[in-house]
């Protein structure tokens, strides 16, 4: 992205974030869980990315929307969690 396009991109980003509002989905007579209101930065960024993908933006390449749930954020795989033995090396 060129430097001259950066202020325009930031302006569009701030306007889009101001217009994004999370509304809970109303459940009918069945006992389904309502959709959580999304106030986290990760969720807002995800919603902005989906908004830009579905709109006709000319800021960059068209990326496909990601389909991840709210349970994905903040999760680690077991391979990333350090074990206690590797932490002992830092104490030496």
UniProtKB/Swiss-Prot annotation:
Its main location: secreted. One of its GO terms (cellular component) is extracellular space. The modification Tyrosine amide is found at residue 73. GO terms for molecular function: hormone activity; receptor ligand activity. It is found in: Secreted. Gene3D superfamilies: 6.10.250.2190. Residues 1-22 form the signal peptide. Amylin/IAPP is a glucoregulatory peptide hormone that plays an important role in the regulation of energy homeostasis. Selectively inhibits insulin-stimulated glucose utilization and glycogen deposition in muscle, while not affecting adipocyte glucose metabolism. IAPP function is mediated by the CALCR-RAMPs (AMYRs) receptor complexes. Amylin can also bind CALCR receptor in the absence of RAMPs, although it is more selective for AMYRs. The mature protein is largely unstructured in the absence of a cognate ligand. Can form homodimers. Interacts with IDE and INS. Interaction with INS inhibits homodimerization and fibril formation. Belongs to the calcitonin family. This is Islet amyloid polypeptide.
